[in-house]
């Protein structure tokens, strides 16, 4: 069972200029007290041919996390166009919103993004050198691809032998610390009370409920050595291949793109969250 369940992601500024910040209103539920913060990241896939062009746009530490339903706004800078191949600046790509606990990623949300010129003239005859100021991005917000990973939320206590604490601490910092310290934010909760049925699926906002039954939750015996399992096993290339542009408003994804997210186990009181 996942201690943290992603309930909804709302893309606030969409469509927007290519140079505008990304803004996401994220709602999640925490079932048990957490000792550490949640780390959220947004990654821009600059090329379908190589992950060398992936850009981490921003990361944010959210905590301490109270038990209940929490909400906050995640902002991230636009990608650096100098790090994107010139022939892949326009067209369809992917952004990945991920969340990790103690260095272990447990949920990933992929969105298709269509980058195109705002005017028909530029779309018909694009300049040899792309004019970034005139490019519009459109995130296909109602068709997220959600991948969940089963992780070990409560790891055994570290070795308390007097000869090993320094070594253990050093290895932990080396393997989990980000290159630069992300920003930190405290989520806020609502004071409103209400109950939901415990057997009702929690869906991503803007996604219709699937016809199939059951959940894509990995069993503990499927855990890999690092404690994670890729439930869907889909690559970024596969995400791109399934996208079909049908009009100038950003297109639509292939059938079956909508994915359900974690189902809350117990009955809880719903709380509105605010951001400090």
UniProtKB/Swiss-Prot annotation:
In this chain, composition skew of type Low complexity spans 162-176
Bias type Basic residues, positions: 181-191
Q: Which domain of life is it from?
A: Eukaryota
Per UniProt, subcellular location reads as: Nucleus
Per the record, the GO terms for biological process are:
cellular response to stress; DNA replication-dependent chromatin assembly; nucleosome assembly; nucleosome disassembly; positive regulation of transcription elongation by RNA polymerase II; protein modification process; silent mating-type cassette heterochromatin formation; subtelomeric heterochromatin formation
Q: Where is this region: Disordered?
A: 159-276
Q: Where is the composition biased (Basic and acidic residues)?
A: 192-203, 261-276
| GO molecular function terms attached to this record | acetyltransferase activator activity; histone binding
Where this protein primarily resides, as one coarse class?
Answer: nucleus
The Acidic residues compositionally biased stretches are 208-260
Which protein is depicted? Histone chaperone ASF1
The record lists the organism as: Chaetomium globosum (strain ATCC 6205 / CBS 148.51 / DSM 1962 / NBRC 6347 / NRRL 1970)
């Amino acid at each position: 069972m996942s201690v943290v369940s992603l309930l909804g992601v709302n893309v606030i500024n969409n469509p927007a200029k290519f140079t505008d910040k990304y803004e996401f209103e994220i709602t999640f539920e925490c079932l048990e007290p957490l000792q550490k913060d949640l780390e959220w990241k947004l990654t821009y896939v600059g090329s379908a041919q190589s992950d060398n062009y992936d850009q981490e746009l921003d990361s944010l530490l959210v905590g301490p996390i109270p038990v209940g339903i929490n909400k906050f706004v995640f902002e991230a800078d636009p990608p650096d166009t100098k790090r994107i191949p010139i022939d892949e600046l326009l067209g369809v790509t992917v952004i990945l919103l991920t969340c990790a606990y103690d260095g272990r990623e447990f949920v990933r949300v992929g969105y298709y993004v269509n980058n195109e010129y705002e005017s028909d003239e530029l779309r018909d005859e694009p300049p040899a050198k792309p004019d970034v100021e005139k490019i519009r991005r459109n995130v296909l917000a109602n068709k997220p691809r959600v991948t969940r990973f089963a992780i070990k939320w409560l790891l055994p206590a570290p070795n308390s032998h007097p000869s090993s604490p320094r070594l253990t601490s050093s290895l932990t910092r080396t393997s989990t610390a980000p290159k630069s310290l992300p920003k930190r934010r405290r989520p806020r909760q609502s004071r409103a009370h209400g109950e939901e049925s415990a057997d009702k699926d929690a869906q991503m906002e803007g996604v219709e409920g699937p016809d199939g039954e059951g959940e894509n939750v990995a069993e503990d015996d499927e855990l890999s050595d690092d404690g994670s399992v890729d439930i869907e096993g889909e690559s970024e290339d596969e995400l791109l291949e399934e996208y079909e542009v049908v009009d100038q408003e950003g297109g639509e994804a292939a059938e079956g793109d909508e994915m359900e997210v974690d189902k809350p186990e117990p009955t809880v009181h719903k709380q509105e969250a605010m951001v400090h």
